Amino acid sequence: MSDYKSSLNLPATQFPMKANLANREGGFLKKWQNDGLYDQIRQQNQGKPKFVLHDGPPYANGDIHIGHTVNKVLKDMIVKSKSLSGFDAPYVPGWDCHGLPIEFNVEKKYGKVGVKIDASTFRSKCRKYADQQVLKQKQDFQRLGILSDWDNPYLTKDFQYESDIVRALGRIVKNGHVSKGYKPVHWCTECGSALAETEVEYKDNQSEAIDVKFRIIDDSVFNMNKPVSVVIWTTTPWTLPANEAVALHPELNYVLVDIGDEYLLLAQALVETSISRYGIEATIGEQTFSGSELEGLKIKHPFYDKQVPIILGEYVTIDAGTGAVHTAPAHGQEDFIVGLKYNLPVECLVDIKGVFFKETELLGGQFIFKANDSVIEILKQANTLVKHESLMHSYPHCWRHKTPVIFRATPQWFISMQKNGLIDTVNREISKVQWMPDWGKKRIELMMDSRPDWCISRQRFWGVPITLFVHKQTGELHPNTQALFVSIANRIEKEGIEAWFKSDAQDFIGNDANDYDKTTDILDVWFDSGVSHFTVLKARKELSNVADLYLEGADQHRGWFQLSLISSVAINGKAPYKNVLTHGFVVDKNGKKMSKSLGNVMSPQKIVNNLGADVLRLWIASTDYTSEMTVGDEILKRSADSYRRIRNTMRFMLANMQAFNPVEHLLDNKQMLDLDKWIVAKTANLQTQIIKAYEQYNFHHVVQLILNFCSNDLGGFYLDVIKDRQYTTQANSLARRSAQSALHHITEAMVRWLAPILSFTAEEIWQNMPSEKNTSIFLASWYQDLTFGYENKAIDITREISPFIRKQMEGMRGEKIIGSSLESEIDIYCETDIFSTLSQLDDELRFIFITSYIRIHSLNEKNDDCIKAIEGVFIKVSKSRHEKCVRCWHHREDVGNNAKHPELCGRCVENVDGKGEIRKFA
C-alpha cells in the first residue's frame, strides 16, 4: 500500500488547540504595556469622531469583586468596539480615595484621631493607604485585559483633583445653590457623622412599636364627660423626649372610642384594627371630626410636664398605626418641614454617638436604642402606654457599619434643591438624556420627586474641606468668598488638602479672622466623584465636557448618576452625560446576593487564575446585563465550553490557511467557487448584525450570533464541506486558493468581532494570521473587504435536506452498516424545480453531503424505501459497494483503473499526477 500523505495539504498552525489562558494571557499584557498600546491607539485615532465613556470611580479599598469586574469589562467592550467603529474612544479610569472606609482601616492600625494620632499624620496615612489600594486594584483590572490610561488615572486624592473639587464647590456657591441649615439628616452613630441618601441602605430590623396617649387638654370641642386622648403609633420610642406636636391629616375623619374611663381619638379608617391590636372592649362613637377641625388643640406630653399642639400634615397616612403621627422636628425630615410651618422648636437631645445629653430629663447619658426600654417603662408608669410589641420592618442602615441610622438635627451645609430652580432644571435635563434600559428614566424621576436637599458636609478628617468662612454674628459668607476659592484652590493644587487644615483663618483672610469662623467640615465623598464631570471631563483635553456615556450598576441611580446630574446642573445648567446605561447586580446560581457570610462569593481573581480572563469576559458578554446576572461554577463551565467552540473554529481556519499569503494567493470574489462566495456573503451579512449589536451595547446578542455562526454555518456545514477540497486538491489550485481566500475573509472579520470580548484570544489569533499586520488587533477597524449580495438556491436546498440525511446516516452507523459518511451513497428524489437546481452541481453535490455518490431522480421514481426530507424531496441512503480510495477515502467506481496508482480514484490520480481536478461549486 502506497503512502500518499505527502501529496495531501494537511492543516498546520502555531495557534495551539489548548488555550492555557491563565498562563498565556500575562504575556500579552506585558507586550501591550511594553508597546505602549493604549498610547498607540490614541495617537492613531487622533482627529476621529470622539466617543467618551466616563468611568465612575470604584472605592480604593479592598480587592475588586465580581461586580467591579462586570462593570469594568462592559466598559472595556464598549470602548474597544467604538475604536473598531472608527471613533477616538479614550478611557480614563478613576478611583474614589477619600471617605470613611479608608479612615476606618487606618484607625484600626494607628488609632483614633486625637487619641493616638494627630489629624495631619492621620490624613497622611490615609493617603498612603489609598495609594496601596489603587495599585492593587489597578493590577487586577489590568489582568482582565482592560485597555485604559492606567498611567494617568484620576484619583480624587490627587492634589490637582482636590483643588478642582474646591473650584467646583466655588462655582456651585457662586450660582446660589449652597446654604447652611439646622436640619435633621441621616446620622450614623458609629461614624459620628451625617450620611447622604446614597450612603443609606434598607434592611429588616426589629423595632419596638408603641401606641402612646397624648391627653387633650382643651377637650370641650368633643363635649364629653370623660378625658380624651389622641393616640400615636411610633417605632422610635427614643424620639418621644423630643416630641413637639402630634400631626393629623386635614381631610381624614377621626372618631372617639369609649374604653370605659376615657376616650381615645383614632382615625376612623383604623379604628377596627387598632382596637383589635389593643385587645380591649370599646364602643366606637358615631360622630366624626376632620383633622382640620382639631388643629391647634393643646395636648399633654406623655411624660414631660409640657404642652404640645395638634397640627396638620398631608403626609399622615392610614397604611398603619392610628392616623395620628408623633412629631419630633429634630429627628425626622417630614417632622422638620411641618415644624417650620408651625414654628415648632427643633431641639436635638442626642450627641454625635447617639447618647442623650446629660441634661436630658429622665434619660440623660443613655444610648438611644438602649433607652427604648427606659422610655417604655416611663410610659407605663405615666399610664400613657396603650400597646407595646416588637416589629420586624425595613429600616435605614449605614452602608458601612450595617447598623441602624437615625435622623438627627445638626448644622450642616446643603445643596438646596429648591433654591434658584435647581430641581426644575434637573428634571428638564433628565428628559434630554437617553436612559438604557428605559425604566432608568422613570426610576431617577421618582427619586428626584422625593429628593431632599443634598447634605454635603461631614464631620470627619479624610476628605476635601468645605473652604468657607462664616461670619460669627450674621452667619453670612465672607464677601471675598469667590476670590478665596481661587486662592485656596491654587494652594491645594500645590500642597493638597493639608494647605487648608494646617492654616488658620488669618492666613487666608488676615484681620477679618476675628469676625469669621473657618469651616471645619469636609465634603461628602459623593461630592468628590459627583463633580468628576468638572474635574476630569472638562479638565482633560482628550475628553469632552459632556460624556457620551455613563455606565454603572443599578444602585447608581441614587448614587453617582443622580449626584453627577445635580452637581453638573448646579455648575453648568445641564446634564454631564448624553446616555446612561445600567447593569444589574451579580447573584449566585440560586439568585442570592453574594456575601461572605453565605459563602457564595465568586472571586474574579480565582476565576482568572483558573479559567483565564477571556472565559470570564465571555460569561459577562453572554449574559443579559440589564437584569440580575447569575454566575456559578456550572455557568462558567458552559462559558468555557463556548470559548473552546470558538477557539477550535478559529484554529481550524488558521490551520487551513497554511502556506497562504494574501498578497500572492487571495482571489477576487468573482474567481471564487460558489460555496466560497456564499460563505463570504453570509459573513458580510452577519458582520452588519454584529456591528449593530455592538452599537446597541447588546453583547449577549453578539455572542449568540458568533456561536451560532461557529456551530451551524461554519462547524456544522462549510468547514466540513471544504475539508476534502483543502486536503486533496493541488496546493496552488484555484479550488484550494478559493477556500483559503474565503477563510481569510472570515478570519479577518471574526478576529475583529471577538476582539472587544475575547481580547487576549483575538490578539493571539491576530499574531498567527498569515498576512502583514499592525502590531495589535486593537489598532484595526472593522474588516471592509467582505462581499455582500451573493445567494445560491442550491446551497439553501442542500442545507434544508442535510439534517435528514445525517439522521439516516447516524441510524446506519448505529446498526454498524457504515462507519464514515463516505461509505454511503445517496439517492435524492425531487420535484422538477429542485431537480433542475441540484443538477447544476453535477458530481460536486457529493462534496456538500460528504458522501461518495449522489444520484438525483425525478420524484415519480421514488419507492417505498425513501424517506421524506422536505416538501418535494425524498431521500434514500445506502452503503456503497465500491472500493475506498486510500487518499481521499471516497468509495468510487474508478478506484484501481490506473495501473500506476491502483489504490486511487480518478480525481486523486489527476491531483497527484495530472493537472489537478476542476471545481466550480464546492
Curated annotation (Swiss-Prot):
Cofactor or coenzyme needed: Zn(2+)
UniProt key word Ligase: yes
GO cellular component: cytosol
Transmembrane segments: none
Reaction equations catalysed: tRNA(Ile) + L-isoleucine + ATP = L-isoleucyl-tRNA(Ile) + AMP + diphosphate
Residues engaged in binding Zn(2+): C885, C888, C905, C908
Location within or outside the cell: Cytoplasm
Positions with a binding annotation for ATP: K596
Sites where the protein binds L-isoleucyl-5'-AMP: E552
Span(s) of short sequence motif 'HIGH' region: 58-68
Superkingdom to which the source organism belongs: Bacteria
UniProt keyword terms in alphabetical order: Aminoacyl-tRNA synthetase, ATP-binding, Cytoplasm, Ligase, Metal-binding, Nucleotide-binding, Protein biosynthesis, Zinc
EC category: ligase
Disulfide bonds: none
Cofactor binding remark: Binds 1 zinc ion per subunit.
InterPro entries assigned: aa-tRNA-synth_I_CS (IPR001412), aa-tRNA-synth_Ia (IPR002300), Anticodon_Ile_BEm (IPR033708), Ile-tRNA-ligase (IPR002301), Ile-tRNA-ligase_type1 (IPR023585), Ile-tRNA_ligase (IPR050081), M/V/L/I-tRNA-synth_anticd-bd (IPR013155), Rossmann-like_a/b/a_fold (IPR014729)
Its EC number(s): 6.1.1.5
Motif 'KMSKS' region positions after renumbering to this chain: 593-597
GO molecular function annotations of the record: aminoacyl-tRNA deacylase activity; ATP binding; isoleucine-tRNA ligase activity; tRNA binding; zinc ion binding
PANTHER family tied to this protein: ISOLEUCINE--TRNA LIGASE, MITOCHONDRIAL, SOLEUCYL-TRNA SYNTHETASE
Record-stated family: Belongs to the class-I aminoacyl-tRNA synthetase family. IleS type 1 subfamily.
Free-text note regarding domains: IleRS has two distinct active sites: one for aminoacylation and one for editing. The misactivated valine is translocated from the active site to the editing site, which sterically excludes the correctly activated isoleucine. The single editing site contains two valyl binding pockets, one specific for each substrate (Val-AMP or Val-tRNA(Ile)).
Subunit and interaction comment: Monomer.
Role played: Catalyzes the attachment of isoleucine to tRNA(Ile). As IleRS can inadvertently accommodate and process structurally similar amino acids such as valine, to avoid such errors it has two additional distinct tRNA(Ile)-dependent editing activities. One activity is designated as 'pretransfer' editing and involves the hydrolysis of activated Val-AMP. The other activity is designated 'posttransfer' editing and involves deacylation of mischarged Val-tRNA(Ile).
Protein name per UniProt: Isoleucine--tRNA ligase
Source species of the chain: Ruthia magnifica subsp. Calyptogena magnifica
Gene responsible for this protein: ileS
